[in-house]
Amino acid sequence: MEKRMETLEQIKETLRETSKLVPDIVRAAVGLEHHYQTVELPHDDGCVKSFAAAFLRPQAQEQAHGDGEVQQAVRMESASCYVPDHDEDAHFVHDAAGVVGGYRRRVGVDAGAFSRGLMTSAFAQLVTAEPGTPVCPYTLLERAYEETLESGAQGGSTAVILSLADGNVLRWAYIGDSAFAVLRDGRVVVRSVQQQRYFNAPYYLGGRRGDEGMTVGMVGEMKVRRGDVVVAGTDGLFDNMSDAELEKVVQIGTALGFSPKNMADIIGGTAYEMSRCLLKDSPFAVEWRKQHENEEGHFYGGKVDDITVVVACIVSSDS
């Protein structure tokens, strides 16, 4: 088992190669084709849209998303992509779990210290556990939080932890707007609920009086099966990419046989382009206008932020 995180050079390479990580058929599927292109499109770019549409499942087509007829032992093949802005997110991917932490900025402190502390503690717990020990996401997060508090780290962090146990049970614990979605047959079947005091003020783990701590943490579980795709990330992902857009990217990636790393890079690269697009609305911008409809000023386009993406593809344990 090993810690798998991007190094600084890999992050820089991701930024340099962002446009190459996002195929034009993905851009066409999510409405970015007129804003970012890596190749010159034909006179009628409808052919690119048609090509993209060929990979997408019709909206009217409903897929059953129960536990499946045959329960099969599965495992996670995971990878990540991190595109920094303030460079205050932290994450890691482990054979037993995927863990993501997003900063909660405070004036005068290292905003990323708390999220990095959470990740360091959680990872240390995993690598020192006996092989085969089931991972309880809530307990892992709770212990990591306690150790981070004891370290004296300032600031705060949202977090999400996912693990696979009992052969085919996906378990999770999260707090704030670090989030996840489980996709089956290209559709979101389970989605975390955003936790916030009010708009753009998420719950978080922190060390000051009045911080929520673990009391508002959400937990749950579901049975997964081969072919499911789990996507976790910080708000930099989900503030810029809607669930419907995430479905399109995953559908195309699945049809093209993307590896988890390819999928994470494509999702991260697409979210990065969305965050910097002023002409295409993001989920954050839409919600901002709802919350400020009686005020002067407007917010359009994407929301620039650190973007962390973890993708876990559920595969047969025999593969």
From Swiss-Prot:
Co-factor(s): Mg(2+)
GO terms assigned for molecular function: metal ion binding; protein serine/threonine phosphatase activity
Domain PPM-type phosphatase residue range list: 73-314
Binding of Mn(2+) 1, residues: 102
Keyword check for Kinase: no
Record key words, sorted: Hydrolase, Magnesium, Manganese, Metal-binding, Protein phosphatase
Binding-site residues, Mn(2+) 2: 235, 305
Catalysed reaction equations from the record: O-phospho-L-seryl-[protein] + H2O = L-seryl-[protein] + phosphate; O-phospho-L-threonyl-[protein] + H2O = L-threonyl-[protein] + phosphate
InterPro entries found in the cross-reference section: PPM-type-like_dom_sf, PPM-type_phosphatase-like_dom, PPTC7
The EC number(s) this enzyme carries: 3.1.3.16
Cofactor binding note: Binds 2 magnesium ions per subunit.
Protein family per UniProt: Belongs to the PP2C family.
Name of protein: Putative protein phosphatase 2C 23
Source species of the chain: Oryza sativa subsp. japonica
Origin organism lineage: Eukaryota, Viridiplantae, Streptophyta, Embryophyta, Tracheophyta
